[in-house]
């Protein structure tokens, strides 16, 4: 496992690059999972120069150890990890965390793999060989997007059918089945629907609302998020009763929604 930079050598490294942090803001922590030693060192060196803390690991065991002991802001996963499948790391992390996940890969960026990874919870893709400047830009986008999904001061709760979405706690609860975990994109997309029930929302509107920013899969990204939400909300995702398609226009949420503002309920 490689951790970089240390507090002692960081100041000399940052002078070579650009630091966009606010005064007093801690270093953003990137956790990289890649068994390619040369790639790990390249990413560590470049991100260090640009004011990031980077922890690089080679397998899921080291990844889990770091994740359990440190605060991580972005995860970068190579799909090809020798004897391991990077998609399993994506699947396990997305099921329990909203940390943005960027996938890097050389020979597994077919459309099917992209769709599968999006369904599992990945946020972005970049193919090897890639521009290190583009890689840095994608990390910065992921960091700009993440604060928009945190609504800790919003005390509203949305109730529909037997579901309740609590914004402050970021929890989706079912009377029948308990809590259902949502990724950041799923949470934002569901909130967009609940704020405008029965209004048809275009893909562009949903893209903005859910903060999905992967140009390579622009149209498919919303469709994949819709599919994931249907699987979690609908009794029969193939015949949805809540999230419905408006042919040629977008999607709409077909249910009565009640909103509670910290105890006061409104339709």
Curated annotation (Swiss-Prot):
Phosphorylated by wide host range (WHR) VirA protein. The modification 4-aspartylphosphate is found at residue 78. Residues 29-143 form the Response regulatory domain. Residues 155-255 bind DNA. This is Regulatory protein VirG. It is found in: Cytoplasm. NCBIfam families: PRK13856.1. VirG is required for the positive regulation of at least two vir loci encoded by the Ti plasmid of A.tumefaciens. Gene3D superfamilies: 3.40.50.2300, 6.10.250.690, Winged helix-like DNA-binding domain superfamily/Winged helix DNA-binding domain (1.10.10.10). Pfam families: Response_reg, Trans_reg_C. CDD domains: REC_OmpR_VirG, trans_reg_C. One of its GO terms (biological process) is regulation of DNA-templated transcription.
